[in-house]
Every structure is written in structure tokens, then in C-alpha cells.
């Protein structure tokens, strides 16, 4: 599964998150549990189990579901879940601490600290835009945000997901055609803090940013595009949510 806001399990979890934020925890749990039942692969199961764990009323049950989520994540063990492991280990550590199991707590604290907050993702990487650019060009920071009027971005953003870049192109301002470029970072890059460990654990969208230019090394001809209605609903949600951009 490539993470997508249009994925059925992700949609169920998003509904649960909204209920959770409104204090309707039992209803939220029903959506998360339905997501786990309907999940068809380890990535979907990992996401749903993580949210089920948040609604457990006892530490033991929370720990049980965190281990279930972790088991699914370790089966995958790729760029979609590796970024979530430090937080998962810390949550498990906290459970063992509450239960008085210091040896297990120390082990999971050690596992959490063994991860540095740097991306392991080696690409390929993509950038979605409506800009008129060509192979060989450099995409640089300093342009206005597609999501907040008059806000100049200090970083250039990219993703390891082709379809995610396609969605970014669809959401970009302007009347030109949507384009998805294959890009190569020319310097260090980091997890996008606007998306990492926000609604979902880790960086499932494989979204990154850099203060250094991205070199265009190719262009994608086709990618999976959301339907018109889905895109409009998603755009409306972005407009409603607003929120401060971490720049």
C-alpha cells in the first residue's frame, strides 16, 4: 500500500481521529477497529492498530495493541514505517514503565535512542508542481506556499511517492498543466515536520524538505490521479484546517 488520504483504511482512521478530537472516544475506537478489520496488508494494519492502541483504557491493553502495531511495522520495515519506530518504542517504553517492568522499559528506550531523526529513504524522489521547468533545471526554495497565501517557503519539498507528488501538483496554484518531476537532492534533507508524527505515526507519506536545490533528472508521464470530487473534498479540508506552517 502506498499511503494515500483516499485509501479506505486511512479514511476510516481520519474519521476516528476527528471523533477523537471531539472527545467521542468510543465512536472513534469503532472506526479504528473497523479499519483494522478491513485492512488488507501490514501497512494498513499497522496504521489502524496504532490508533486502536490510543483508545485502550488500561496500560496492558494499550501495550498489547502497540505490540500488534509494531509487529506489522517490522514486517514491512521500509521507508513507510521506519520513521515511526522511535515514537513506537517510546510509547512501549512508557507502558512498561507504568507497569513497573524496568528492564523492558530500558530496552525499548535503548531501541528508541538508536534511531537518529534523519531519513533513511534513498528515493527515487518526486516533486509535483505546475511550474514550467525542464530536465536539468534546479528547483529552489523561496517561493510562496501553495497552501497559505503570501507565505514564502524556506525549503523545497519533495516525496518518495509518485502519486503523492501528483496530488501536490493537483493542489498547486496556477493554471498550467500538472507535472511530476523526478528529482535529486543536492544537499541534506529532513523529514517534513508539517506531516511527520502529526496525524499519523512517522512519515508515511515519505515527505521531505531541503534548504538546498533539487535537480530535475526526469519527468513522470503517468500517475494515479484522484477523482475530481475527491480532490475538491480534500482541498476543502485543507482550507478548513488552515494551521501554522512549520517553515
What is each model feature region?
Residues 1-3, 35-42, 73-83:
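Flexible helix-coil transition and linker loops at the boundaries of alpha-helical arrays
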Residues 7-8, 24, 44, 61, ...:
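Structural signature of alpha-solenoid helical repeat junctions
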Residues 7-30:
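Alpha-helical segment of the N-proximal tetratricopeptide repeat
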Residues 98, 103-123, 130-133, 146, ...:
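Conserved NAD+-utilizing ADP-ribose enzyme module
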Amino acid at each position: 500500500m502506498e499511503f494515500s488520504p483516499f485509501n479506505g483504511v486511512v479514511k476510516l482512521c481520519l474519521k476516528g481521529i476527528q471523533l477523537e478530537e471531539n472527545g467521542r472516544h468510543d465512536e472513534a475506537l469503532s472506526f479504528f477497529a473497523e479499519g483494522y478489520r478491513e485492512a488488507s496488508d501490514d501497512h494498513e494494519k499497522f496504521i489502524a492498530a496504532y490508533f486502536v492502541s490510543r483508545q485502550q483504557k488500561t496500560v496492558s491493553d494499550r501495550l498489547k495493541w502497540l505490540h500488534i502495531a509494531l509487529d506489522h511495522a517490522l514486517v514491512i520495515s521500509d521507508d513507510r514505517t521506519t520513521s515511526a519506530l522511535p515514537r513506537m518504542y517510546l510509547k512501549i517504553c512508557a507502558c512498561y514503565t507504568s507497569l513497573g517492568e524496568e528492564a523492558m522499559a530500558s530496552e525499548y528506550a535503548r531501541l528508541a535512542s538508536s534511531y537518529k531523526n534523519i531519513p533513511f529513504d534513498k528515493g527515487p524522489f518526486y516533486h509535483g508542481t505546475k511550474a514550467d521547468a525542464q530536465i536539468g533545471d534546479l528547483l529552489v526554495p523561496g517561493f510562496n506556499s501553495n497552501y497559505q497565501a503570501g507565505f514564502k517557503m524556506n525549503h523545497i519539498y519533495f516525496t518518495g511517492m509518485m502519486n503523492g507528488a501528483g496530488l501536490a501538483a493537483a493542489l498547486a496554484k496556477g493554471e498550467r498543466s500538472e507535472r511530476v518531476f523526478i528529482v535529486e537532492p543536492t544537499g541534506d534533507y529532513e523529514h517534513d515536520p508539517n506531516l511527520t508524527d502529526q496525524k499519523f505515526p512517522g512519515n508515511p507519506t515519505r515527505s521531505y524538505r531541503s534548504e538546498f536545490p533539487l535537480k530535475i533528472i526526469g519527468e513522470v508521464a503517468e500517475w494515479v490521479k484522484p477523482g475530481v470530487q475527491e480532490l475538491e473534498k480534500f482541498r476543502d479540508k485543507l482550507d478548513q484546517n488552515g494551521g501554522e506552517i512549520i517553515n
